[in-house]
Curated annotation (Swiss-Prot):
It is found in: Virion; Virion tegument; Host cytoplasm; Host Golgi apparatus. Keywords: Host cytoplasm, Host Golgi apparatus, Virion, Virion tegument. Signal peptide: none annotated. It comes from Saimiriine herpesvirus 2 (strain 11) (SaHV-2). Pfam families: Herpes_UL7. It comes from the Viruses. Plays a critical role in cytoplasmic virus egress. Participates in the final step of tegumentation and envelope acquisition within the host cytoplasm. This is Cytoplasmic envelopment protein 1. Belongs to the herpesviridae cytoplasmic envelopment protein 1 family.
Length: 265
């Protein structure tokens, strides 16, 4: 994944953290495991009357850190044109290599993951809430300016901007970071002429690559574990309804070893 990013950017490891990433973290969920039961779920939405409850979020993240059942945050990383909203434009074996569990020994990075998970599961985002999430993420980044924090901050700003555009909110972040192009195209086609939609969506927003048969590694081990997946049905979580995505999520969440870095130092 890092190699893909560096090739597309044309930069080396040293200055990569200073660049806008061509990849974004997606499908972020908390993973907890107890014996043979594994649960992947979105971070609870700590929002009251449109206000981000920072202290509650901090308490939740710290409780995860000290829980022996917490495995980490599962996430996948997409290059922008691979995320077609309704479908994923990559083959299962490629998606599998982009899917991992992240568990840094740093509450700042974990809280940024929590913000990402909350953000993609918001049913009714508002301008003030999106701004609060971005501001909190930026504050956290100032406390830990490592490559992973920079990458997560970029993901939060990008998804907040995309959410603002998609729901017609016009939050300030939209003028700072461009929304994801395929989501802009999706909204444009959906809001357009019905006849055109039937023609354009199959051309620009449909991929059958994920329907390719793929036998995930450690399949036998994952089948011995009960796996449950919980999330809110939003425009950012459509991929979690795909059977191949679910199969790979189960495999990774139940059998893989968490990693402490997304991008190497």
């Amino acid at each position: 994944m890092e190699v893909v990013a560096r090739v597309l950017l044309g930069v080396n490891k040293t200055n990569m953290a200073c660049q806008e990433q061509p990849i974004v973290p997606r499908l972020v969920l908390e993973v907890n495991k107890n014996k043979n039961v594994c649960i992947a779920a979105n971070t609870p939405c700590f929002v009251v009357d449109g206000v981000l409850m920072v202290e509650q979020l901090k308490t939740h993240i710290k409780s995860r850190m000290f829980s022996n059942k917490f495995v980490g945050f599962v996430m996948a990383c997409f290059v922008e044109n691979e995320d077609m909203v309704d479908s994923i434009n990559m083959f299962p074996h490629v998606f599998s290599s982009r899917l991992f569990i992240y568990n840094p020994c740093n509450h700042i990075l974990l809280e940024m993951c929590g913000l990402l998970s909350m953000l993609k599961n918001l049913n009714t985002p508002s301008s003030s809430l999106l701004s609060a999430i971005v501001e909190r993420a930026y504050y956290l980044w100032t406390k830990s300016r490592c490559p992973d924090a920079t990458f997560l901050l970029h993901g939060i700003k990008t998804l907040a901007s995309t959410s603002s555009y998609f729901y017609g909110i016009n939050a300030p972040v939209e003028s700072i970071v461009s929304p994801l192009l395929m989501f802009k195209l999706y909204k444009c086609i959906e809001d357009g002429d019905p006849v055109s939609k039937g023609l354009l969506k199959p051309i620009y927003l449909t991929s059958w690559k994920m329907d390719t048969q793929y036998d995930a590694p450690s399949k036998d081990l994952s089948e011995k574990c009960v796996f449950n997946l919980f999330y809110c049905n939003t425009v950012f979580t459509k991929h979690l309804q795909h059977k191949e995505v679910l199969k790979l999520f189960k495999c990774v969440c139940t059998t893989s070893t968490p990693r402490s870095n997304i991008l190497s130092q």
